[in-house]
Amino acid sequence: MHRRLAYAAAGLVLAGTVVAPAAADSLSSVSVPRGPDSPGYQLRINTARLGISVSRGGEQVLRTASDAFTFDGGVATRVRSVSRDGATVVAEADSTAGRPVTLRITPRPDRFDLSWSVGGLAAGQRATHFDLATSGYWYGGGETSEGKAQPYPLSAGVVDEPEFSPASYMMQEPYFFTSKSVGLYVRTAQPMKVALAGGRADLTVTNSAEYTSTVFVESSRRAVYDDYIGEVGKPAKSDATDAEFKSPLWNSWAQYYRDIDQDKVLSWARDLKNVGVAGHTVQLDDKWESNYGNLTFDAKTFPDPKKLADDIHAMGQKFGLWTTFWVNLDSANYAYARDHGYLVHAKGNTSTPCTVTWWNGTAGIIDLGNPQARDWYTGNLRKLMADYGVDGFKFDTRFFDDRCATTGSLTPQDYQKLGADMTDAFDQQGAGIRTHWGNQHYGFVIRAVDADTSWDGLRTSLRRASAISADGYPFVETDMIGGSNSMPPPTREVLVRWAQAASLMPLMYASTSPVSTVDTTTGKTVVYPADTAKLYADAVQTHAKLAGYLKTQVQQAVADGTPIMRPVYFDFPTDHRFDTIDDEWLLGPALLAAPMITAGTARDITLPAGLWFDPHTKRIETGGRTLHNYPAPLDTSPMFVRVGAPGWTDLVRDLTR
C-alpha cells in the first residue's frame, strides 16, 4: 500500500492514502497509526537529555537509559533543536565532550530506523543504552560465550560479551527482541560489545562513525521475527539432505577426544551398528592430521585411511573429516602458506602473518580474502576426497580473527560470507558451519557450541539451539548428544535424556556411544548398562518417525523462513507463561516437546490452549493448564500433538505405529 508522511506545524503523523490529522505534539513526537499489518506506535524524543521512548496502545514498550547515547569520551545531553528532513526527524544535541550529536529517526508503519553520529569525531565506539524495566524480557543475540551462562531470557541473567563480533566463533547476531514485541537490529559489519545487567542493556558498535539500527514495533514476537528475516533473508535452501534429518551424524570427538586411531574409530562405528543405533555419517574429529594445517593423515594412527573410508562406506554411511582454517607454526604447510601470502596479515604490518593462539596451539589463518589462498586450501581438501574417499567435512573454525587485519577494504562480516561461500561447495554432512551475522540465506545446519556433559550442559545446549533458531537459522541441533567439553562422560541418564531431547529437534548430532566410551580424565573405559543402547536407539527411532513431518517443516522454512524449533509463544503470543519456560518448545506447528532435562521420572508440563494428544498414553489432554508431576520414566520423553494443527493426523499415525 502506498504510504506517505503528513506533517503539521505541531507534529508528525504517518498516514496511509488519506492524510491523518496531526496530534498537537511537538516536533519531538511521532505518531504512527494502526494499520492492517501494523499495530501503530508513538515515539517521543526526550529533549531535556537526548533519549527516546516508544509506546504502543498506551503502554510504554521501549525506553533508552538516562545516558542513552554515549561515545568515546562523552555522552549526549540537552537537545538544542528538532527538525524534519523529509520523512526523517532530526534532533541536534549537545554532549559532555563539547561535540554535537545528531540523532535521525525515520518512522515506518511497523518500525523505525534510528541512527546517530558525533560531529568531528573519528570512527570509534558508539553505544546505545536501554532501560530493561519498560521492555519486558529480552531474547536474541544468539549464543553467549563458552564458559558463560546462557540466560533465558537474556535479561533474566547477566550477559557480558566484550567480543560480540562477526568474526566470533560463537553464533552471534546483532538482533534482539523483547516480550513486548519490540525488536532491535543493529546494522553493523564491525565487532560490538553487548551487556545486559543492572536493569539496562548496552549495545556498543566499534570502529564506527555512526550507530545505525532498525527498531521493529509489532503486536507479536513472531511478527518481529518475520520483520527481521525480511531484512536479512530467509534460507534459500536446506543444505542438509533428507537422510541427515532422519538419523544422527556420528563424530568421534566426545567419544575419544584426541586419543583416536583407525582401530578405535572402526570399533566404535561397528558397536553402534551392532546395537541398532542408526547414523548417516561417521566423522573423524581432531587429531587425524599429522599436524594442524598439514591436511594429511597421521600415518602412525591412521596407516590406511582409504581402507577406513571403505569400511565405513560398507556400513552404509558416509565418511568425513574435521578441518579448520588454522595452520600451526610448526606444521609443514605453515612456511609454504606464509611465503605465498596465503595467511591473514598482522594489524599494522601487512608483510607479516597474523599469529593467534587457539585451542590447539599457535597458528596463522588462511586468508579467505585471497582467492589464491582459497584455491590452495580447497585443493588440499579435494585431494583428500580423491585419494581416500572422504565425502565431506566438518568446518570447525573461525573465518577471521579480530586480532588480525582484513585484506583490502574487507570487513569481518565479509569474511563470514567468504567462508560460507567456500564451504558451501562441500558436503557439510549435517555438522554445518557456525556462520552468522546475517548469513541465514545459506540454509546451513547450525550446531550449538561445545557443552558440559551434565544436566546443566544439556539445558544450556538447548537454550543455545533455541536462540540460534529464533535468530533465523532453522536447521539447528544441540552440541553432541551427551556433551563434549573434555570432561568425564555423561551418566546413563544424562546421555539418554539428551538423546530424547535431540530427537525432538530438526537434527541429531552424536558422539558418545551408548555402548561404552572413554573417561578422558582418567583414561579408563566406561561401559554403560546394557539397556542404554536400546533407550538411545529408541530415541533415534522416534526422530526417524518424524522424518516426513520434518520434511514438510524444512520446505516451509525455505519458503518463508519459519523456524522449525521455536518458542511456544511464537504460536501462542498471548500466553506469557512461556516467556520464561526453556524446557518446552514447538517443533513445527503440531508437536510440543517437553523432554526431561533434569534428573527424575516426572515433571510439570505447561500446555497451551487447545487439545493435545499424548502419543505415549494415547490420551487427549485439554490445554490452557499445567499438568503437574506428569510421568516420564527413562523410556519416555513427553511430547504432545496439537489436535487440528497442520500435519497432526500424520504425526499421530507415525508416532503411534
Where are the language model's segments positioned?
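Generic recognition of flexible, low-complexity loop/linker segments
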Residues: 161-164, 171-173, 237-239, 270-272, ...
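Aromatic- and carboxylate-enriched substrate-binding clefts and catalytic-loop regions
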Residues: 129, 144, 151-153, 278-536, ...
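N-terminal structural segment of carbohydrate-active enzymes
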Residues: 141, 240-285
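Catalytic core of carbohydrate-active enzymes
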Residues: 421, 441-448, 461, 470-478, ...
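Catalytic and substrate-binding clefts that recognize carbohydrates or anionic sugar/phosphate headgroups
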Residues: 30-242, 263, 269-274, 571, ...
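Conserved, mostly hydrophobic/aromatic
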Residues: 40, 175, 250, 272, ...
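Secretory targeting and sorting signals
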Residues: 1-24
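Glycine-rich, histidine-containing beta strand-loop boundary motifs that form or position
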Residues: 47, 56, 93, 105-107, ...
